[in-house]
């Protein structure tokens, strides 16, 4: 089988585009999102699409004094092919609650992801989630009466309209069996 070399033109040709591309970063995943955006903008310019400065759609997850939060998407995503970045393992993100500095837990990151998906309100053409470390991925099989958080989270994402999950080095990639009709890409770092 011949090796196929794809270039920027294969991804940014207007005649082949199904939907406009949009990137959304959950709190804590902004750096990764900006890195991906810089590559995409460079590739788009290489094929003559000079009117694109960024594919990032501004968003935020502000917190109230009660600790509750809300998801805000600050531009239209109608008809876009969205890629939402979330890093559940990033403990450096903090917020103030009752005068104390709190760090976001993996549960907080997952809820921020769900909030931003809700803020899109089903208007995107397709939603893909890029999650470098799979939420709940270390607990992949039931030993006694315990929850299967990763499988349940994947099912929740499917139920709110996510079509693709992209993760890196999942602890047990068989967790994709929880959502057999959804695309699940487990990129292994050893391929690089």
Q: Residues of each region from the PLM?
A:
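PRPP-associated nucleotide enzymes
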Residues: 1-192
């Amino acid at each position: 089988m011949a090796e196929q070399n794809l270039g920027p033109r294969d991804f940014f040709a207007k005649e082949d585009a199904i939907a406009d591309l949009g990137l959304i970063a959950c709190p804590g995943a902004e750096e990764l999102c900006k890195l991906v955006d810089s590559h995409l903008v460079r590739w788009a310019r290489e094929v003559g699409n000079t009117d694109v400065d960024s594919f990032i759609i501004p968003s935020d997850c502000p917190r109230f004094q009660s600790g509750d939060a809300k998801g805000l998407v600050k531009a239209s995503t109608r008809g876009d092919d969205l890629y939402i970045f979330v890093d559940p393992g990033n403990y450096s993100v903090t917020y103030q609650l009752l005068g104390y500095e709190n760090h976001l837990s993996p549960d907080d990151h997952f809820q921020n992801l769900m909030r931003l998906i809700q803020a899109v309100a089903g208007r995107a053409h397709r939603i893909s989630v890029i999650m470098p470390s799979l939420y709940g991925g270390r607990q992949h099989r039931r030993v006694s009466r315990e929850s299967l958080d990763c499988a349940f989270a994947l099912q929740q994402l499917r139920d709110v309209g996510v079509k693709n999950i992209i993760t890196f080095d999942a602890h047990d990639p068989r967790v994709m069996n929880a959502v057999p009709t959804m695309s699940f890409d487990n990129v292994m770092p050893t391929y690089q």
